[in-house]
């Protein structure tokens, strides 16, 4: 299941470097408004890619029995639902990649990105997995759900940081034009 999900993540991996290149090209030209425009374009592409990958993951989840004919029904069932949960957060995962590896670091916001990843992973994802799996007895569903929760929280935090941060305006003291 993870292999199939990772294929879609790799397919979107070029968006973050594209964000860095296009934003810094605009910054080099001295235009913060152009940098913001490039960031918004990359975000639209990331949203579209995430939605497309969601649809493709849902399709892939139905192909599991054909791809893995010698696997038991219980494993196929868990894998099917795991892929559906992964598909539901695919847009958030792609946006997290673009925000965390492209847009926010372009605004010299790397420390925030690292802190957000640490907090989301170790203060949200891991405790949620422990709670869902051990305390509530959800097993694999708890792991899938805690990963989804972590990705959604990161996407919200990164979006809010992008939307309301002054980091891009502070870049090299560039005036808005």
Language-model segments: residues:
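Small-residue-rich hydrophobic transmembrane alpha-helices
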Residues: 1-61, 94-113
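Short alpha-helical transmembrane segments in multi-pass integral membrane proteins
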Residues: 23-89, 132-177
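Short, flexible coil/linker segments at or flanking structured domains
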Residues: 3, 11, 52-53, 63, ...
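Short runs within selected transmembrane alpha-helices of multi-pass transporters and secretion channels
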Residues: 13-16, 86-106, 112-124, 128, ...
């Amino acid at each position: 299941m993870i292999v199939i999900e990772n294929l879609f993540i790799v397919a979107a991996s070029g968006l973050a470097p594209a964000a860095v290149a296009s934003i810094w090209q605009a910054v080099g030209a001295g235009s913060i408004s152009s940098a913001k425009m490039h960031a918004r374009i990359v975000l639209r592409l990331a949203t579209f890619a995430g939605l497309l990958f969601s649809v493709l993951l849902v399709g892939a989840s139905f192909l599991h029995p054909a791809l893995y004919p010698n696997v038991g029904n219980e494993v196929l069932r868990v894998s099917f639902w795991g892929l559906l949960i992964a598909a539901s957060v695919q847009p958030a995962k792609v946006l997290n990649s673009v925000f965390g590896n492209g847009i926010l670091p372009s605004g010299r916001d790397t420390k925030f990105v690292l802190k957000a990843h640490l907090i989301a992973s170790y203060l949200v994802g891991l405790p949620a997995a422990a709670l869902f799996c051990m305390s509530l007895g959800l097993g694999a569903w708890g792991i899938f759900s805690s990963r989804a929760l972590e990705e959604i929280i990161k996407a919200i935090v990164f979006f809010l940081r992008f939307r309301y941060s002054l980091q891009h305006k502070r870049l090299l003291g560039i005036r808005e034009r």
